[in-house]
Amino acid sequence: MKITLLGTGGPRPDPKRMGPSTLVRVGFDNLVFDAGRGVAARLVQAGVPITDYAYVFLTHLHFDHAGGLADLLFAAWNMARNKTIHVYGPKGTEAMVRYLFEAYERDIWYRLSETVLTHEKLVDIRNMVEVHDVGAGLVVEGDDWRVTAADVDHGHGLGLSRDEWTCLAYRVESKGKTVVISGDAVYSPSL
């Protein structure tokens, strides 16, 4: 298991720090946790081709943690990726990705139409991305790894319940090694 911090910045742009994102390499799989600003470029800088990841896990749906998701998905698609990308996140993730596809519907149509001239093998991105709203418990298992989620409290003293503002931490286990990744969180017994 190899961990790479792709971005550790916050919601305010900083030329020295990209938005929150962590890459966990487990065997031949690249797992991306959070998709903050600049995640696609940082993934490539880390030596991972933009077409060589299959799993994205969002801790919560603040723009600084999920704002780079469109770039991550569309950049891989535009490079003729044709394998499924799985996106996991708290309640609302499915709706967010659906809205992204609606917002870029004309662009999707344009690029698919363009393949008649370029002869590229571009599949419809809407058929390439599987999105899963998840909660606490087992999220997904790979060949030699598994990811589970726990509900955590975001904090900031806003008084929002976990039902009103769902935040997740993820636990990656592989071959006796474990790493826990959380986005914004205050002390949470589940963590």
Residue ranges and their predicted role:
Residues G176-L191:
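Active-site-proximal loop/helix segments of hydrolase catalytic cores
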